């Protein structure tokens, strides 16, 4: 079941838990996976889920439509993506973990899905804030292993140089050449 936004949804920063929450109803809250160190605002606030938030929510849902997620997984990724767009402070690219594929012509589009390749694995990300040189992304794979000790799990937010983004349709062909 896909959750539909309504006028009662509210973003809340809980200072006690140091967590951003989406209050969906009196008895249901969604805890955003963005770590406090990546949030632009870390003091108590409450803000309604806006029309822009709803628009992003439905756009991201549509962009993930072809992927084999359960409805709860899809909603979780999308809510984390909307929260990241709205509340994440500017991040520094950590592109050194990723292989340079340089297969992108032009700027990526909002909601477009790409594959990324590291020394250890590959995974998929969705663009949540495109840029001309680097873009803010959310991990949609279960995890992406960056090095022997560090990995990004699903719904983690990262900034990547666009030269590291492998168009999703070309990923199979590219990855088969690597094997």
UniProtKB/Swiss-Prot annotation:
Keyword Transmembrane: no
Keywords: Cell cycle, Cell division, Cytoplasm, Septation
GO cellular component term, pick one: cytoplasm
Cellular location(s): Cytoplasm
Keyword ATP-binding: no
Record InterPro entries: ZapC (IPR009809), ZapC_C (IPR048372), ZapC_N (IPR048373)
Pfam families referenced in this protein's UniProt entry, alphabetically: ZapC_C (PF07126), ZapC_N (PF21083)
BP terms from Gene Ontology: division septum assembly; FtsZ-dependent cytokinesis
Known partners and oligomeric status: Interacts directly with FtsZ.
Job of this protein: Contributes to the efficiency of the cell division process by stabilizing the polymeric form of the cell division protein FtsZ. Acts by promoting interactions between FtsZ protofilaments and suppressing the GTPase activity of FtsZ.
Family statement drawn from the similarity comment of this UniProt entry: Belongs to the ZapC family.
Name of the featured protein: Cell division protein ZapC
Species assigned in the record: Tolumonas auensis (strain DSM 9187 / NBRC 110442 / TA 4)
């Amino acid at each position: 079941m896909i959750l539909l936004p309504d006028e009662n949804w509210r973003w809340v920063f809980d200072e006690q838990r140091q967590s951003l929450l989406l209050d969906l109803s009196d008895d249901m809250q969604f805890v955003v996976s963005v770590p406090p160190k990546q949030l632009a605002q870390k003091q108590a606030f409450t803000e309604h889920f806006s029309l822009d938030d709803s628009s992003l929510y439905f756009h991201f849902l549509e962009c993930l439509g072809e992927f084999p997620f359960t409805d709860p997984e899809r909603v979780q990724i999308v809510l984390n993506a909307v929260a990241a767009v709205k509340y994440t402070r500017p991040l520094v690219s950590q592109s050194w973990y990723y292989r340079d594929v340089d297969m992108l012509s032009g700027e990526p589009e909002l909601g477009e899905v790409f594959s990324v390749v590291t020394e250890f694995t590959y995974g998929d990300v969705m663009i949540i804030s495109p840029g001309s040189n680097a873009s803010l992304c959310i991990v949609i794979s279960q995890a992406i292993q960056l090095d022997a000790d560090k990995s990004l799990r699903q719904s983690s937010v990262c900034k990547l140089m666009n030269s590291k983004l492998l168009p999703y349709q070309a990923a199979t062909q590219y990855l088969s050449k690597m094997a």
